[in-house]
Amino acid sequence: MQYLKPINVFSEIGRLKKVLLHRPGKELENLTPSIMKRLLFDDIPYLHVAIQEHDSFADTLRGNGVKVVYIEDLISETLSNDDSIKEQFISQFILEAGIRTENKTRALKDYFCNMSVNDMISNMIAGVTRDDLKNYKSDSLNSLVNSEYPLIIDPMPNILFTRDPFASIGHGVTINRMSTKTRHRETIFAEYIFKYHPIYKDNVPIWYNRDEDTTLEGGDELVLSRDVLAIGVSERTESESVEKVARKLFEQKISFNTILAFQIPQSRAYMHLDTVFTQIDHTTFTSFISDDMKFTIYALTYDVSSGSIKVKSEKAKLEDILGFYFGCKVNIIKCAGGDLIHGAREQWNDGANTLAISPGEVIVYSRNHMTNKLLEEFGIKVYQIPSSELSRGRGGPRCMSMPLIREDI
């Protein structure tokens, strides 16, 4: 089936037809113990095994009829046919990498311009070391003071999690303002893809942009149905951003009539809504709830006559709230069945971060064996992938993927 729109995502569970990934690369080998926390990693993955695990993920998707595209290929296609756009992109990337001195900027421009576009993108993601710019010399105070730091531009290891920099909603996208400085550059790629790529330019409405002054990340955005969108208010996404997206969607008269704002604790363990809540079938969800992880849910609707957004606090249980908006009884499968120890362990390793590839079929990390067994007992078809290295970045199958096209349900 051919889709008239390049973005078509009106659910979390419609059969996945096209998805965006990033295959791990040298950026993981430029992680060091001194910078990994700042770059949001809890440990240093072993690249060779991380690639094997990610290839298993991509092969599982392809084996189920999903077209896999890689972000580095999309941005390379965007820049390859217009030198002026490429030069603009390079300048913006260098500036947003925190480079301010004229000599260093010139050296980096020369470095990036003297390679193919594909290699340039790979090296931008990998980060630039002092050894990469062997001909660059500077006696500025800044360079001398920081001469022991091996990196001129930090690597971008979090681009592995393609879910976050932008999010597909309906026929459009939010291009997000990331919460942490280290992830800001990731959204430059989305900006250029949707502005200049021949498939996406002029064809994709933008519901939110990266120059907004409040943060929004894709792991907090879940398209529950054509009518209902869920957005987390979390460590990474601010409540003001939820209202901005809601107003844009309501005023553009997109199909969504309700935005459910899920407030969750501001915690590394629960950084996004999809670390504690995902949809896996028409009426079935995975979730993690504990003494320190509870949902507070607000419903945002639009009053057409006044042009105002109405906000109502939902007081019922999660399953009852969802049941009301879905118009039927729903099932909640808790991580490890709600076991205090195993539930917390498996949530930490993304047991609730499932990726639905069609209704009732999900990709999960094999390590979360208790949760996976429960899914199978509920009749869910479970595709398990290895994750000893991928999980070190605190993201699961949903985090590592951005659906571009899903079949309507």
Swiss-Prot record:
Catalytic activity: L-arginine + H2O = L-citrulline + NH4(+)
Disulphide bridges, residue numbers: none
Predominant cellular place of this UniProt entry's protein: cytoplasm
Pathway: Amino-acid degradation; L-arginine degradation via ADI pathway; carbamoyl phosphate from L-arginine: step 1/2
Catalytic machinery residues: 399 (amidino-cysteine intermediate)
Cytoplasm found in the keyword field: yes
BP-aspect Gene Ontology terms: arginine catabolic process to ornithine; arginine deiminase pathway
Subcellular localization, as worded in the UniProt entry: Cytoplasm
Annotated Gene Ontology cellular component terms: cytoplasm
GO molecular function: arginine deiminase activity
Enzyme class: hydrolase
Keywords linked to the UniProt accession: Arginine metabolism, Cytoplasm, Hydrolase
A Pfam cross-reference name: ADI
EC number: 3.5.3.6
InterPro entries: Arg_deiminase
Recorded family membership: Belongs to the arginine deiminase family.
Name recorded for this polypeptide: Arginine deiminase
